[in-house]
Structures are given as structure tokens and as C-alpha cells.
Amino acid sequence: MNATPASRVTPIGEHEIGAAREYFVGLHTRLSDAWAALDPGSAQRRDEWQRPPGDVLSGNGRLSLIENGAVFDRAGAAFSDVSGARLPAAASERHTELAGQPFRAMGTSVVVHPANPYAPTSHANVRLFTAREGDVWWFGGGFDLTPVYPFDEDARDWHRAAKAACDPSGAGVYAALKDACDRYFYLPHRGETRGIGGLFADDLNDTTAVTGGDFDHCFALIRRIGDTYLSCYRELLERRRNTPFAERQRDFQRLRRGRYVEFNLAFDRGTRFGLQSSARTESLLMSLPPRAEWRYDYQPEPGSPEAGLADYLKPRDWLS
């Protein structure tokens, strides 16, 4: 996603920022309630936190977490609205003119690690960043799917839903956001994507080449991304949550979760932003699976379902 210099962005005010916050809080509540209803026997926790002015970051947030359930090994959803005096390097590397300036960042993120190896891991995030008291702003967001045992049906449904979320914003938006997702969620040291992709949008404002449009136009796309994630992933989860599995599948699931950890800690910009800005550590590490494994020179048996996963860990047109 390409944007022109930040100084050309049409400013926004507290009304627009408040509308975005209201949506992010509501999405967090809907996600938290949906996962809790799916796994009522699990260990569930909901926290609210606040950091006073004077800290490196000030603001507030909410976190919901489900662990050790019949459906979820871990499912977390987090909302935060924080302000800082100096923009961290992870957020200013593509906006050098904003380096070291005050900022405000808010959004909702969710990561789900299902118990059943046939149910895919998922991630979604929607966010708004502002600086210079609203003179500079951009939305970001997207979702991606990381199966251990992939199904073509699931991949096609996922990408159909992604395209439907993008189409009202323009004919080329899905293709651009899908390509950005394939490029972002990539492990260069492994030579593979994190999963089968989805959507990835950053720097969305009225100067963005692909989407264009004013605040309302960009905000509508972000809302469709958040709403589509919840409805589509819940359907896939219901479809696969009761598939029979054995210890072999759980073993491979732990190995693949190791790759998930590698990406989040080594490459994810959101994690780097949080670490550089002294964000809440528990919220940052919520995205990691509770159990992962690394095995020296592991090679799946040729011709096995485990070996077949490699064919899915590369960009593919799922809608042709």
C-alpha cells in the first residue's frame, strides 16, 4: 500500500477518532463474547488496565483470554488506546518525518489457537494511528489464516469473504490487500508464508493510491474487515472443531506453532512497536501459542499430509 507524504492528509477531529474507538471497543466485546460462548468450560479471564500520564505510554485497554478449553488452547482479544511522547522506530520507519513525535494509537487485535489441529489458527487486527493532533492519521488492519492441515474449501471460503469485504472499496482493493498479506506474513529464513493469507492494509487514508477516499471511506473498509473476520472464522471453526485427531496431529501442530512464534517475535511490526514503546507485555505476548516445539532438522514423511502443507505456504490465487 503506497501513500503520499503525511502532510497532504485531510485532518480529522475528535468526532472521527471517537467513532473509531467506539467500533474497536464494540468489536472487542463481540469477539470476546463469541469465543466465550463457544468454549464455556474453558478458563476465561477479562482484564481492564490503565496507564496514567507520565508513563512512556498512557491510556487504557481491555483484554480477554480463554485457555485450556475443549475448543481453544488459547484465544485472546485485546483493545488498547494509548498515547506516547515519542513515536517508536517501528512505526516511523516508513514515516521518517514523524520520528520522535507525539502520537496516539488505538485498535483491536485477536489471535486464536484452536485445540483441534484441523481447525486453523487465525489472526486479525484493526487500528487507527494519529499524530500532530489529527493532522496525520492512517488506518491499518487485516486478517490471515494459518492452517496446520489445510482444506481447499476453507481457503476458498476465506478468500471469498475477504474479497466481499474489499469490493465496496474498489475493484482492485482485494488483489492489492491480498498481495500485501502474502508479502508481509512471510518467513524469509524458512522460505514460506505463515499460512494461506488473507488481507493486510496499512497507511490507509485519503492519499492511499489503492483505496483512496476520505476518513469515512477508509473506516468503512476497516469495519468490514473486522466484521468479516468474526463471521467467516467462526464458521470455519465450527466446521473443523470436532474433526477426529490423534497425537500425531497434535505433535505436528506444536511444530507448526513454532513457526508462528518465529514470525511474531522476529518479524511482526506490531510486536516490535509494542516492545519499543514499552507497551503492556501481557497483551503483546497474548498472540503466542501456549505450547510450541522445535525439532532439529525435522522432515515430514514424503507423501504425508504433513508434507503436503508446504504446497499451501506460498501465494496462490484461491478464487480462480
Name these PLM-found stretches.
Residues 133-177, 320:
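Compact, glycine/acidic-enriched structural inserts
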Residues 165-221, 235-238:
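Long, charged, mostly alpha-helical binding arms that flank functional sites
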Residues 178, 182-200, 238-283:
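An amphipathic alpha-helical core segment
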Residues 61-140:
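Internal mixed beta-strand/loop scaffold within catalytic domains of large alpha/beta enzymes
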Residues 12, 16-95, 208-246, 250-260, ...:
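Gly/Pro-rich turn-and-neighbor structural signature
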Residues 66, 70, 78-102, 146-152, ...:
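Mature, function-bearing regions of proteins
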Residues 75, 104-106, 137-144, 192-216, ...:
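Glycine-rich, often proline-containing surface loops adjacent to acidic residues and nearby aromatics
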Residues 3-10, 276-320:
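TerminUS-proximal long segments
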